[in-house]
Amino acid sequence: RMIYSCLVDADFLDTEAFMKQGKTERDPGTRIEELYRKLDKYLENKRWLENKKPDTINGRRSEILRHCMDMGTQEKGMFRLTVPTGGGKTIASLAFALRHAAAHQMKRIIYVIPYTNIIEQNAQVFREILGEENVLESHCNIDYTSSEELRPMQLASENWDKPVVVTTNVQFFESLFASKSSKCRKLHNIANSVIIFDEAQMIPPEHLKPCLAVIEELAAQYGSSVVLCTATQ
């Protein structure tokens, strides 16, 4: 399936280049290293790391953030992040992912979230920090065909060719299991990525075995790192 995904995407891209006479409307976005610098500047401006009082909410957020940033230098693999609601999990997980991706020359960060309202909230936060052109929302409520200005995003949604992708459980696992070439096209761009499952406990129990099997395969054989996030134990 990984080889098939490469072939399908290459075929689509070659056809697109031929039809456009070599001119591309695609914008792959900013390099991960530069995005990490953008986040660093954001944290400095917002003074996220300055509060070191453990008996305050902001102090605990800073502590969690520092720990996640420190863990970003660890070797690739499987990770778990358990942070109660209000603990700054969104920023902390992004900080880990960007530092980890920069340290290991990884291609992109993929957030997998069960609810579209949370996707929209998180994607907006990421856009404010990293820039609109670097964050792709990929779910059923998004329509990139309504404006010519959104054409690069429409093209990126076909194969997830952006540095930060925010998507649903359904879209992510369809890319891994579905038989349609249009779904499988994204698969090779999942390799060598940091994959963050927010609210990981929401994966349906009846689907856990195959889902965990492919997640472990991505980490073991395809250079990805996986973070399982939850606000509950």
Label each region the model flagged.
Residues 105-129, 142:
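Conserved Walker A/P-loop ATP-binding site and its immediately adjacent core
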Residues 1-50:
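N-terminal accessory nucleic-acid engagement/regulatory domains that precede
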Residues 131-177:
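Inter-Walker segment of RecA-like/P-loop motor cores
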Residues 83, 140, 199:
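The Walker A (P-loop) glycine that initiates the GxxxxGKT/S ATP-binding motif of P-loop NTPases
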Residues 75-98:
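Walker A/P-loop
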Residues 73-75, 158-162, 178-193:
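Short basic/glycine-enriched coil/helix segment immediately N-terminal to the Walker B
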Residues 170-173, 183-221, 226:
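SF2 helicase catalytic motif II
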Residues 44-82:
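Conserved pre-motif I regulatory segment
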